[in-house]
Amino acid sequence: MTTLTPLRSVTVNNTYPYTIAIGPGLLHDPLRLAATIRGRHALILSDSEVAPRYAAQLQETLLRARPDLHLNVFTLPAGETSKSLENFSAAIAQLATLGATRDACLFALGGGVIGDLAGFTAACWMRGIDYVQVPTTLLAMVDSSVGGKTAVDIPQGKNMVGAFHPPRAVIADTDTLATLPLRELRAGLSEVIKYGAIRDPVFFHWLQTTREALLARDPAALAQAIARSCEHKADIVGRDPLEKGERVLLNLGHTFGHAIETAQGYSTPGSNNLNHGEAVAVGMVLAARLSNALSLAPAQDTETLKNLLDAYGLPTVLPSGLTPEMLLERMRLDKKNIAGRLRLVLWRGIGHAEAVSDVDEATVRQILANSTNQHTTYSPHQHATTKPPNRRPH
């Protein structure tokens, strides 16, 4: 059901500016959606969880405004394992079959996996076509849909093959969050917390006091969290679109997090492996503890961050089965490293972060060892089976 929450808009100002529209009912807005299409060909890329709920609605809305449109839908299995070179090739084949020309448009309907794969496909087809991010998860709305990072995974690491290719628009229909599993909602809130942790103490405090409303999917609280997160990312991406400087700060927790995801094997629906948001939550605590060890941040702030993540039901210690060397092996392949030395985003306390080069591996190994020795009661399966509110998708 569409709420009365007002539409919010955030603009990313760089070489190719675009607008992030945030609000309910946007999948029913033919003028907004059709305005993103310059040609006569479009492809909707989605997954097996999202397509049955929303692909037909997006099709109907687009064709209502553009009955001349040649429009196909391509659906992939849900889960991180779909973000592969094989599925990239399959998506390219779909564009070829469609007869897509350089003025075609690709719609990424789903979460971060679909957005990343669709963006990379759009970046490569005929050296670049338009694509529109239509995120249906909180994590995609606040993070992966904004900024133009596109990629696929390979066995050696996450997001190792990709390109910078900004979307033509981001259209975030918040009504889709009504059907989002609680585990995925929490994963998105991990990235929301990150924005407060790296640059906004006021927002961090707001998240401490608004937990119940956010977990209950209060429309006004969610809209505020999404808009504020997007404002932070748009501000940084507008100045540093290619991650040559401050944009790297958005990776707090990600070096550890990506290593966890790769070492465990990427998460699929129903699996025990941590998903991206969960891995980043653990990664933020590890980065904060490393910062404590290097005398960069007060231990009290680290406990405050850990307690906030705990309060949102997110994991904060390494899952069982991972060793420090397993993780370090993957961290050495991280894209942020320079001259073969670890480069991590570390914490300076609530609202502050910085990139630190030449981080001592022995200290990192000790932080990882300390975390593996801690007991965790976090249960991904419990969150995976928690049902969202009993609301019918519009």
From Swiss-Prot:
One of its GO terms (biological process) is aromatic amino acid family biosynthetic process. Zn(2+) binds at E191, H254, H276. This is 3-dehydroquinate synthase. Pathway: Metabolic intermediate biosynthesis; chorismate biosynthesis; chorismate from D-erythrose 4-phosphate and phosphoenolpyruvate: step 2/7. Its cofactor is NAD(+); Co(2+); Zn(2+). It comes from the Bacteria. Catalyzes the conversion of 3-deoxy-D-arabino-heptulosonate 7-phosphate (DAHP) to dehydroquinate (DHQ). It comes from Xylella fastidiosa (strain 9a5c). Belongs to the sugar phosphate cyclases superfamily. Dehydroquinate synthase family. Its EC number is 4.2.3.4. Its main location: cytoplasm.
